[in-house]
C-alpha cells in the first residue's frame, strides 16, 4: 500500500481536505484522510490538488478528423449540413485518417484529465482504439432513421452488432437514438424495449438542442421538415404531436433514470421538471452549443431544477479540444452563482453515475479505482474548488501512481 499526500484532496463526495492523503493498494482506494499520521510507503506530491479523473459524458470521437473542418454557424441546421458534407468527403469509416484522429482524440482526452467517456458512434469505429486505450467508456451505437418501416429489425440488428464487439472489462456498448427530428417514434420505443433487460447500461439521445427541433415537434414544419424532405428521409405518415421534444420522448417511454439526455438548450422549466421527475441525467456542452448555433444553455436553471447535470465536450467538429476543465470554465461563466462544488460533481460523479460506472469512478472513496489526477496549483489558492472550475490547462495535470503508467498508452 502507498499513501499519496497532497496540498489538497478533493474527494467530490466530501468537502476538500487541506494537507490530505489517499491510501492506495493494488489500484484501489483504501482510505482518505487529512491527519498527520505517517505511512510505511508514502509519496508527497507537493503543491497539487488530488482529485478523481474527469468524466466526459458526451463526445463523438469518430468525428475527430473533422477538427477545424466546419466553420461556426448561427443556424444549427446549417451546421449539420456542413457536417454531412464533410463526412461524405471521407465515406470510409475505417480510413487511416479517421482512425489516426480517433487515437489522437483519445490521447488528448487522457492528457486533459479524462478517465471515462460516453462516446457516440454511428460506425463503431472507435471501439478498437478505446479498448487499446487507458480510457473507460460507454460506447453508444447511435441510430438515425426517421422513416423506419421496420424499427424492430433495425434495433435488433444494432443489438447484434454491439453484442458482436470484442468483450472488454472497461468498455461497455449500448444504444443511442440521435434526436427526435431524426429518429422515428417506433425506434425510440424499440430501443427502450431492447435495453430494458440490460439493466447495467444507459441509453442516450440529443434532446431540445435547437429552436428548429422545438418547431418541428410542435408543428411539423420548419428547417428540419425541409431537411428531411431534401435527404429523402421524410415519413408522410408522421404527425407532429404538438408538444415539446421532452414531452414527446417522455410519452414514448424513453425517459427514465437510465436516460442520458444531451444539450437541453431549449428546455423550459416544465421540461426540466419533467426530466427531473424521471431521474434522467442532462449533459451540457456549452462550448459546442455556441459554435453550432444551437444557443446558450440555461445552466443555472438546470441546477435549480434538480436535474442531475453532467458535462460533455461534444466532438472536435464543434469544439477546439476535449478538455472537460475548459467546459467547466464555460459553465462557470454562464452560471456564476452555481457552487463550484456542484460543477465539479457534474464533471466527475454525476457523469460516472449517468454512465453506470459510479462504483469505479467519479469520486475518491474507499473501494473505487485509484484513477487519481494531480493538478498543480499556486500556493496562494484558498478556494480550491473555484480554482478548478476557472480553467485548467493540460500542462497543469499529471496522473498518479498506476494511473500514470496506464496513461502512457495515450502517448504512443
Language-model features, listed with the residues they occupy:
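Active-site gating loops and adjacent loop-to-helix segments of metal-dependent hydrolytic enzymes
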Residues: 65-99, 134, 138-144, 210-258, ...
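His/Asp/Glu-enriched, well-ordered alpha-helical/loop segment
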Residues: 226, 251-254, 295-379, 397
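C-terminal cap of metal-dependent C-N hydrolases
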Residues: 353, 369-412
Amino acid at each position: 500500500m502507498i499513501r499519496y499526500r497532497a496540498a489538497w484532496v478533493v474527494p467530490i463526495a466530501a468537502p476538500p481536505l487541506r494537507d490530505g492523503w489517499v491510501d492506495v493498494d493494488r489500484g484501489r482506494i483504501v482510505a482518505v484522510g487529512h491527519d498527520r499520521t505517517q505511512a510505511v510507503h508514502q509519496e508527497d506530491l507537493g503543491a497539487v490538488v488530488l482529485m478523481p479523473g474527469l468524466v466526459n459524458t458526451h463526445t463523438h470521437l469518430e468525428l475527430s478528423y473533422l477538427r477545424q473542418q466546419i466553420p461556426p454557424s448561427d443556424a444549427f441546421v446549417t451546421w449539420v449540413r456542413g457536417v454531412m458534407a464533410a463526412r461524405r468527403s471521407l465515406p470510409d469509416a475505417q480510413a487511416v485518417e479517421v482512425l489516426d484522429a480517433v487515437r489522437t482524440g483519445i490521447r488528448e482526452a487522457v492528457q486533459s484529465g479524462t478517465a471515462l467517456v460516453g462516446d457516440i458512434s454511428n460506425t463503431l469505429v472507435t471501439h478498437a482504439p478505446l479498448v487499446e486505450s487507458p480510457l473507460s467508456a460507454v460506447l453508444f451505437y447511435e441510430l438515425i432513421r426517421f422513416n423506419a418501416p421496420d424499427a424492430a429489425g433495425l434495433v435488433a440488428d444494432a443489438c447484434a452488432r454491439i453484442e458482436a464487439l470484442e468483450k472488454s472489462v472497461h468498455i461497455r456498448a449500448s444504444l443511442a437514438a440521435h434526436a427526435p427530428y431524426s429518429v422515428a417514434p417506433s425506434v425510440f420505443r424499440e430501443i427502450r424495449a431492447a435495453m430494458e433487460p440490460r439493466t447495467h447500461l444507459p441509453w442516450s439521445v440529443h434532446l431540445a438542442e435547437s429552436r428548429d427541433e422545438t418547431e418541428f415537434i410542435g408543428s411539423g414544419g420548419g428547417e428540419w421538415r425541409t431537411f428531411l424532405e431534401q435527404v429523402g428521409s421524410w415519413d408522410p405518415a408522421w404527425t407532429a404531436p404538438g408538444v415539446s421534444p421532452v414531452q414527446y420522448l417522455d410519452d414514448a417511454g424513453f425517459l427514465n433514470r437510465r436516460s442520458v439526455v444531451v444539450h437541453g438548450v431549449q428546455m423550459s422549466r416544465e421540461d426540466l421538471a419533467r426530466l427531473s421527475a424521471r431521474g434522467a441525467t442532462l449533459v451540457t456542452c456549452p462550448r459546442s452549443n455556441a459554435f453550432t448555433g444551437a444557443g446558450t444553455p440555461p445552466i443555472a436553471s438546470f441546477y435549480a431544477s434538480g436535474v442531475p447535470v453532467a458535462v460533455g465536450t461534444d466532438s472536435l467538429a464543434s469544439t477546439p479540444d476535449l478538455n472537460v476543465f475548459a467546459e467547466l470554465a464555460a459553465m462557470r461563466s454562464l452560471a456564476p452563482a452555481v457552487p463550484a462544488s456542484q460543477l465539479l460533481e457534474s464533471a466527475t460523479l454525476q457523469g460516472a453515475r449517468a454512465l453506470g460506472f459510479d462504483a469505479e469512478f467519479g469520486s475518491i472513496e474507499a473501494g473505487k479505482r485509484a484513477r487519481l489526477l494531480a493538478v498543480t496549483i499556486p500556493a496562494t489558492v484558498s478556494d480550491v474548488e473555484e480554482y478548478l472550475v476557472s480553467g485548467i490547462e493540460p500542462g497543469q495535470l499529471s496522473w498518479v501512481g498506476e494511473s500514470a503508467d496506464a496513461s502512457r498508452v495515450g502517448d504512443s
